[in-house]
Amino acid sequence: MSMFRKKRKEQKTYELIKVPENANFFTKAWIWYRNYRIKQKIKKQKPQTFAETIWSWTKTLVGAIIIVMIINGLLIASFVVPTGSMENTVMTGDFLFVNKFIYGPSTPQVVPFVNIPLPFYKFPGIKKPEVGDVIVFIYPGDRDEVKSKEFQYYLKRCVATAGDTLQIIDKRVYVNGKEFPLPEHGQIDYSEPISPYNKWETFPPGKGYTRDNYGPIRIPKKDDIIQLDQKNWREWEYFIKKEGHDITFDGVSILIDGKPANSYKVERDYCFGMGDNRDHSSDSRYWGFIPYDNVVGTPIMVYWSWDTNLPLSQIGKKLSSIRWNRIAKFIN
C-alpha cells in the first residue's frame, strides 16, 4: 500500500536578497519589491494562529466597509422605496441605484448597515436639482422641529427650485404661472372632492393652505430677504431655526440671536418636493422646503423589486412577489 502513498510536499526555502553597497536607486527598489514578495511567501508557509486568523478576517471586513463607504459616498448608492408616495413612477419595494455624483459626491453620511449618521462634507456637483428631477434626499425634519428625530432618506419629485413661485389650484400645480403637468406615471384623482382638511397640518403654519389648494409661495433662494413682523414670524420660525439661528418675540420686537430684527437673509438654496401620487404623499406641502445640501442624488434604475412587507419566513410568497417586469427599468 505504501507505493500509493502520496509524498508530503516539501516546503520551499526562501532567502532574502542582500542589497549591494553600490546599488543604484532602481536596483534597490527592485530588491525591496522582491524581498517583500519573498516575505509574503514565507508568511504563507507558516500556519496561522487563531488570533492571526481573526485579525486577517477583521482587516478584510474593515477594508470592505471602507470600500463600500467610498463608493456609497462618491458614486452610486442603493435605496429601497418604503412607501407608495411616488407610484407608479416607482413602487413600494423597488430597489434603486442612485447616482450621487450628479448633485455632488460627499463623504459618507452614515455608517453602512447600521444607518448611524456621520458629519459629512459635500463636494460641488455637475448640476443643481432642476424642476422635474426625481431626487433622493436627507429628510429635513417635520414642520415644527429643528432636526429630524431620526436619519431618513426620502424620495420625491422636485417641482420647484430656489427663486420659483409655486401654487396649487384645485390639485393642479403651477410654477411661475405655468402648469407643471402630472408626470407620465403619476396618479391623481380629479373626481375626488377637493380636500378642505389638514389646513392646520400644512407648511407654513398658520397660512391655511391645503393639500389641493396651496400657495402661492416663493421657494427661498440664497440671499433672499424675508420681511418679518408680528403676524408672520411664526410662519418662518422653524425655517430660521433650521438654518442655525434662534428667533423669538418678546412682546415688542422680533429677536434673531438675541438682536432686534425685522428681516432675515436666507443662507441656503431650497427646492420643493412632491410625490407623483399626489393625493397620498407626505411632502413639502406638509413639512417644508428641502435644502439643496440635503439632496443626495437621483435614481437611475430599478435593480430589484418585490414585496418588502413579506417576511423571509414566507420565502415562497416572497419569491412569487418578485416583479420581473420592473427589474432594469429606468426612472424618469
PLM regions: where:
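Soluble "head" domains of membrane/secretory-pathway proteins
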Residues: 2-53, 89-332
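Hydrophobic membrane-insertion alpha-helices, especially the h-region
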Residues: 56-75
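Alpha-helical transmembrane signal-anchor/signal-peptide segments
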Residues: 77-95
